Regions:
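Short cysteine clusters
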Residues: 50, 74-77
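Short cysteine/histidine-rich metal-coordination sites, predominantly Zn2+-binding motifs
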Residues: 64-73, 88-96
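N-terminal pre-ligand scaffold of iron-sulfur
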Residues: 1-67, 82-83, 97-121
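Short beta-strand His + acidic residue motifs that chelate non-heme Fe in jelly-roll/DSBH
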Residues: 81-82, 90
Length: 121
């Protein structure tokens, strides 16, 4: 595994997230909440903040996906987002995007950017 320690950090093992599921994280020593959606060997990582009002998307721990598992859902106002792009495709913030976090899988580990993007204030 090759980690650029100045730019990346290990979030977790890929196997810690079942395929087709999502999991939320509070990175160590950070106030930034992120969540990961796993699709096979690929992951999509976003800041856990809805662009409608910049509040967390999940109503309960790790509840980020629609019942079918095909979309990310903000349970506060019912906005639906594409897993692949983070774009709101239904609800109060159509056309707005979740904030993506640079991430990759290397040797079974999920690596994310050390410096995370921030939602607007």
């Amino acid at each position: 595994m090759s980690i650029d320690a100045g730019r990346e950090r290990i979030l977790c093992r890929l196997e810690d997230i079942p395929d087709g599921c999502a999991r939320g994280f509070l990175p160590v020593d950070r106030d930034d909440r992120v969540f990961v959606v796993r699709r096979g060997e690929r992951v999509h990582v976003y800041i856990n903040s809805c662009p409608h009002n910049w509040r967390p998307l999940d109503y309960a721990q790790d509840r980020f996906l629609s019942a079918s598992g095909s979309e990310i859902v903000c349970y506060a106002h019912g906005a639906h987002f594409s897993i692949d792009s983070g774009e709101c495709i239904a609800g109060v913030c159509i056309g707005q995007f979740l904030i993506p976090v640079p991430a990759r899988v290397d040797n079974g580990m999920i690596l994310i950017a050390r410096e995370l993007p921030q939602p607007p204030e």
